[in-house]
């Protein structure tokens, strides 16, 4: 008779989890950041708030964002005027949009990831779906399973209302699933639509306007699994370790509350300062076992919560400007996409590395770090190992 230990050994994968494919998707509606303040104040019937509009213009100018993509068009907003007010009851209208559109956008990204992976979708064993855009039962994970035609026995995990750190969370969870279930192939999807957070301006709550200047809509998907099949599956990055921590003295720094008026965000403390002050501790804990202490010797994927966070992290750690190049590029091209951001940066980095003829998917370097930052303040730290291009 076999022992429990023998059963456990047979259930576990031999090698580390790897990212095998990445896919992304975007709504068709593209918004130019330079003209967005005029549009935003017009569509929310707030053009009389001239001083506030000038403040918002300065926010957009300093955002380092060139363009964003949004599901909410002028037509949709005119049909739902309560969404355009600052604090009008509007949750039903918002839910009607995101419950349908979040899984649909996720499906687009997932199909691209599955195509790159090259295996039949019947080989997907697990689905991890993450969104901060709305809540429903059965969830977006169920809707995605139906939209893709996955097996009814696929094991699903739905993560709602996590916020901007959750791109790191889904990678950490998928790593554990892949390494502890031999042959597992985990479809990870992050899909975010700002229909839950869009609202008109308020001169008493400027932190709400920060979000209006930064957030954009997109979805990203990955296939994660261990022990890739030779000649069939090609890993892009290996997942070496993953950790989560709460930063000291940061309670209330970022809050989000789902109310009748939608999802409201509040920035209550110096978020860039809190992150930059504490980030090196997470780096030391993650890289000391590898004998790495030079933060310029690794590649970087950091959630671009905003330019101030990136600037202060860069300054605190004396990072060379090119270290956050991929992160800044994604911020410029898409804005802050909450949980989907770090997946987009991974995609940007591996594509740029190949295009530039660099030796690895990590800008020619072997080791790298992925950071997710969000409400809590919560920090996700993932150590990555690149592969040859």
UniProtKB/Swiss-Prot annotation:
Task: Name the catalytic site residues.
Answer: 164
- Catalyzes what? (E)-4-coumaroyl-CoA + 3 malonyl-CoA + 3 H(+) = 2',4,4',6'-tetrahydroxychalcone + 3 CO2 + 4 CoA
Enzyme superclass (EC): transferase
What pathway does the annotation place this protein in?
Answer: Secondary metabolite biosynthesis; flavonoid biosynthesis
- Name one molecular function that GO assigns to this entry: acyltransferase activity, transferring groups other than amino-acyl groups
Domain of life of the organism encoding this protein: Eukaryota
Q: Which GO terms describe its biological process?
A: flavonoid biosynthetic process; polyketide biosynthetic process
| CDD domains hit by this protein | CHS_like
The record's keywords, sorted A to Z, are:
Acyltransferase, Flavonoid biosynthesis, Transferase
Q: What is its EC number?
A: 2.3.1.74
Identify the InterPro entries for this entry. Chalcone/stilbene_synt_C, Chalcone/stilbene_synt_N, Chalcone/stilbene_synthase_AS, Polyketide_synthase_type-III, Thiolase-like
Q: Which family does it belong to?
A: Belongs to the thiolase-like superfamily. Chalcone/stilbene synthases family.
PANTHER family from the entry?
CHALCONE SYNTHASE 2 (PTHR11877:SF94), HYDROXYMETHYLGLUTARYL-COA SYNTHASE (PTHR11877)
Task of the protein: The primary product of this enzyme is 4,2',4',6'-tetrahydroxychalcone (also termed naringenin-chalcone or chalcone) which can under specific conditions spontaneously isomerize into naringenin.
- Protein known as: Chalcone synthase 2
